[in-house]
Curated annotation (Swiss-Prot):
Changing S202F: In H9; increases fluorescence at 395 nm excitation. Keywords: Chromophore, Luminescence, Photoprotein. Changing V150I: In Azurite; shifts the excitation and emission spectra to shorter wavelengths and increases quantum yields compared to BFP. Changing F99S: In alphaGFP/cycle 3 GFP; improves folding at 37 degrees Celsius, reduces aggregation at high concentrations, and increases the diffusibility of the protein inside cells. The modification (Z)-2,3-didehydrotyrosine is found at Y66. GO terms for biological process: bioluminescence; generation of precursor metabolites and energy. The gene is GFP. This is Green fluorescent protein. Changing V68N: In R10-3; matures to the red-emitting state with excitation and emission maxima at 555 and 585 nm, respectively. Photocytes. InterPro entries: GFP, GFP-related, Green_fluorescent_prot. Energy-transfer acceptor. Its role is to transduce the blue chemiluminescence of the protein aequorin into green fluorescent light by energy transfer. Fluoresces in vivo upon receiving energy from the Ca(2+)-activated photoprotein aequorin. Changing S65G: In EYFP; leads to yellow fluorescence, folds faster and more efficiently at 37 degrees Celsius and has superior solubility and brightness. In GFPmut 3; highly fluorescent mutant when excited at 488 nm. Highly fluorescent. Green fluorescent protein has been engineered to produce a vast number of variously colored mutants, fusion proteins, and biosensors. Green fluorescent protein can be mutated to emit at different wavelengths such as blue for BFP (when Tyr-66 is replaced by His), cyan for CFP (when Tyr-66 is replaced by Trp), and yellow for YFP (when Thr-203 is replaced by Tyr). Further generation of mutants led to more stable proteins (at 37 degrees Celsius for example) with brighter fluorescence and longer fluorescence lifetimes.
Length: 238
């Protein structure tokens, strides 16, 4: 067990803070909840603290919760491939570019680390080149979320990982908005981290609303499990 992994043996409180600017529409979001890496479970509630969110909530899910991939459940035979926990408590910087097909892009930079007993994800998001009447700024996405696989590989030069995946957002007219994600994670501290063999995270997310919440918000339940490296096949993945 890495030193960082020891911090995730029970339920851990999570705080998420995001400052965003999409096509000049500025906004802030604050999220709170908890994670349980034993089950790969996240329960979070996000509130737009600046009024109405200028983009659809589902477009921010990967920035919020795929940002705290340290809560992914890694099976025993894969624990030596868990970069995310091994970088704790100092944490990691997570940088991402998200390309929305036939529309604009988000660039995000997050610092994910422990502050006391709380796992904090602080994010800056900049969005450019979005069409004002497109699926994103035109709010044409359904309020739901599909399951996805997130592909991880080691980046030995930067002592971190590279991650890529494609998200399918459901549109109200029955079509799909694709979003390509390119992600880089590098440790903040200078201690040893685990550099993984290629594998993936399987994610299931459910969005809901709090009937008692008057502010613009999103409630998220998510399960994340690492997979792709099987027992006794280590040689194939070297």
């Amino acid at each position: 067990m890495s030193k960082g992994e020891e911090l995730f043996t029970g339920v851990v409180p999570i705080l998420v803070e995001l400052d965003g600017d999409v096509n000049g529409h500025k906004f802030s979001v604050s999220g709170e909840g908890e994670g349980d890496a034993t089950y790969g479970k996240l329960t979070l509630k996000f509130i737009c603290t600046t009024g109405k969110l200028p983009v659809p909530w589902p477009t921010l899910v990967t920035t919020f919760s795929y940002g705290v991939q340290c809560f992914s459940r890694y099976p025993d035979h894969m624990k030596q491939h868990d970069f995310f926990k091994s970088a704790m408590p100092e944490g990691y910087v997570q940088e991402r570019t998200i390309f929305f097909k036939d529309d604009g892009n988000y660039k995000t930079r997050a610092e994910v680390k422990f502050e006391g007993d709380t796992l904090v994800n602080r994010i800056e998001l900049k969005g450019i080149d979005f069409k004002e009447d497109g699926n994103i700024l035109g709010h044409k996405l359904e309020y739901n979320y599909n399951s996805h696989n997130v592909y991880i590989m080691a980046d030995k030069q930067k002592n971190g990982i590279k991650v890529n995946f494609k998200i399918r957002h459901n549109i109200e007219d029955g079509s799909v908005q694709l979003a390509d994600h390119y992600q880089q994670n590098t440790p903040i501290g200078d201690g040893p981290v685990l550099l993984p063999d290629n594998h993936y995270l399987s994610t299931q997310s459910a969005l809901s609303k709090d009937p008692n919440e008057k502010r613009d918000h999103m409630v998220l339940l998510e399960f994340v499990t690492a997979a792709g490296i099987t027992h006794g096949m280590d040689e194939l993945y070297k």
